[in-house]
């Protein structure tokens, strides 16, 4: 498991421009991520996803996020997420640790 505080810094630097995490947070360019763990791809209420995201059919969890965040366009070809990914596994683990905490509050 990664470091929550380091993960928060990564989120602020690389994710917060397009995503929110708090319960009831607004969608931006990307969906609000609250409740993402255990949710199917393309299912945040009120956000318009590509068919690729809706049809991927996986459940978000540590393993699926670890793979997705390395290279989003490879994991879900056709996603509208323009972020290139995080190559360092340790940084992805930190971000996932933060998301696990922040999206479940």
UniProtKB/Swiss-Prot annotation:
Modified residues (Phosphotyrosine): 49, 98
Matching Gene3D superfamilies: Cytochrome c-like domain
Modified residues (N6-acetyllysine): 73, 100
Residue(s) carrying N-acetylglycine: 2
Subcellular location: Mitochondrion intermembrane space
Gene Ontology terms: biological process: apoptotic process
Family according to the record: Belongs to the cytochrome c family.
Role noted for this protein: Electron carrier protein. The oxidized form of the cytochrome c heme group can accept an electron from the heme group of the cytochrome c1 subunit of cytochrome reductase. Cytochrome c then transfers this electron to the cytochrome oxidase complex, the final protein carrier in the mitochondrial electron-transport chain.
Name the record gives this protein: Cytochrome c
Organism in which the protein naturally occurs: Macropus giganteus (Eastern gray kangaroo)
